[in-house]
Amino acid sequence: MFHCIPLWRCNRHVESIDKRHCSLVYVPEEIYRYARSLEELLLDANQLRELPEQFFQLVKLRKLGLSDNEIQRLPPEIANFMQLVELDVSRNEIPEIPESISFCKALQVADFSGNPLTRLPESFPELQNLTCLSVNDISLQSLPENIVFSKCALLEELDLGNNEIYNLPESIGALLHLKDLWLDGNQLSELPQEIGNLKNLLCLDVSENRLERLPEEISGLTSLTDLVISQNLLETIPDGIGKLKKLSILKVDQNRLTQLPEAVGDCESLTELVLTENQLLTLPKSIGKLKKLSNLNADRNKLVSLPKEIGGCCSLTVFCVRDNRLTRIPAEMSQATELHVLDVAGNRLLHLPLSLTALKLKALWLSDNQSQPLLTFQTDTDYTTGEKILTCVLLPQLPSEPTCQENLPRCGALENLVNDVSDEAWNERAVNRVSAIRFVEDEKDEEDNETRTLLRRATPHPGELKHMKKTVENLRNDMNAAKGLDSNKNEVNHAIDRVTTSV
């Protein structure tokens, strides 16, 4: 008597198998039945520790996913996968990449991130069809001395972030098709001049390094839209920045800038400019030429004045200059008719210009202790000038002493939890990186609708998130081991847990 065999057991022509999140400890034996036809194999997020010899008989594979396993070795037999186009072995325990990887000539997308690698194979440039390479978070200390990036001429995305790289080879300028370059979280003190050859580069992230200067040749990045150079040691920005006509996002927060070049006003496509935590005394007059600028953040600088040209930023919607030394806001600010949020808390303002009443503000922050985004103002006269002015219960501004418990920081300043808050009113104010802006509907809308509030916080870059998590974990360990903090350990840990959860 004949029994019907399930159709799937008869079918020897299977091109794709997806076994992700299946708690696999071993590679399933049945996979090898389809060695002649299998082109896509996804074994991500399992508990695989090794790849058996038989595994490398799947020579038809074009896409192989092995991320988030416990694989401890990538055998030299990887060379058998000569038709492989995509390889993802990220977040495993692989200590080295075999030199035989160079035989995978068809490889276009390779992700080795999150492994305990300390070096790349010398043969890596032989992968001449690579378009996307991720080797971030692998403790890489240097690139091969003889690496010739010109052989990887098709490379479009290169992620070297969160390693220990001190120098970049000059040959990086040969990656003429490169669109995205991540170098964040390394030990770079300079960038090679040749980086200016990357005419097609759209995004450059060199945040969290040790850069003291940028090369003038950066002006050659004529396609650049995103430039992130946060958390470095920069004191100046080259005038060549003005030649980046397509630049939309510029983040230079947490550096040592004392001034911005006038050339920044030539970045005609700029929509977001982040200058937080520098040493700026003023902003360039040319900033008024940035007609597309919608978000300008210069919190925690040393600004003593604002140029009247700031009113020329006709698209500006959010303007933050919290914790500076401003004594007045220029009346021309009212010309920025799209402005909805103005944060001037923590300054030395005596009053506000009457012209601000022309703006349709949804939030005007004058103090950390302000309970509502909008206040009731009265008109008065400035007896020194005779001009009409605005005043309220929070003007003139008085120094405040924020506490760590009241204002838990945005992870970038978690060290405040173990340092005493300074008592000096203006000069050495405790760093508070909570830039929270609450939006509410206009008073007219409140009459018709329920009152609603939205808490807006600056969205961290993905690289910053990883740094934030490490900072929180290290701080927790240090504080728990410190003497004299036992009494408030629970309170601090509870605070850190809240921050960790938000990350």
Question: Where on the chain are the PLM-derived regions?
Answer:
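The feature captures the LRR N-terminal capping module
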Residues: 1-285, 292-295, 305, 363, ...
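Ankyrin-repeat TPLH-centered helix-turn motif and closely related helix/turn capping elements
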Residues: 300, 308-409
